[in-house]
A protein has these predicted regions:
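Carboxylate-rich, polar loop motifs that coordinate divalent cations or form catalytic acidic clusters
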Residues: 1-175
């Protein structure tokens, strides 16, 4: 709780205070604008901390349990990736749509994670190896990114991808 400079550990009670009632398993994501997204079952909740407003989205054909779900945002929209399905929640339109025109690379990424950068680029990576795929925008082709071969580490498995306001992309590996 930033207003009270307090660390909250009872998340369900806090969510209830802001109008989000959850039962069972849920996922939480804080977006690039520091707003809260909560996903549970076929519902997505968006809480804007600055305006103290809550939006609710219905995600049709979304499985109730998605333990392998990866979440990212581009500052406006939320992207949900699981198995070989990519969904985009359009915050301004208050709707969810399946991004069918994006075919995910079938190369040997076993466990896919997604990161969307500030410029609309989409990054896929795995915690288990150094494979990285990048798409400049939804309409462009996938490019496989190779990490510099002179990096001397025992493992280049990608742990995270972030970009900064200067346009630099930072790729975190095991070592």
């Amino acid at each position: 709780d930033r207003d009270k400079d307090n660390f909250i550990t009872d998340i369900p009670s806090y969510l209830l205070k802001i109008g989000i009632q959850i039962n069972g398993t849920y996922k939480v994501h804080v977006d690039k604008r520091h707003n809260l997204w909560v996903l549970q079952g076929q519902n997505a909740f968006y809480f804007n901390f600055s305006h103290k407003t809550l939006k609710t989205f219905k995600i049709e054909n979304f499985p109730e349990e998605t333990p392998e779900l990866s979440i990212s945002d581009d500052g406006e929209n939320l992207y949900l990736l699981w198995n070989s399905t990519l969904l985009k929640l359009e915050n301004n339109a208050k709707k969810c749509k399946r991004v069918d025109n994006i075919s995910l690379p079938s190369n040997s990424i076993i466990e896919k994670h997604i990161y969307t950068d500030y410029h609309g680029g989409i990054w896929l990576y795995s915690y288990t190896d150094e494979q990285i795929f990048y798409k400049k925008n939804i309409k462009s082709e996938w490019n496989q990114i190779k990490l510099h071969s002179k990096i001397e580490t025992k493992s280049n498995a990608v742990r995270s991808i972030l970009d900064d306001s200067n346009g630099h992309v930072w790729i975190g590996t095991d070592r």
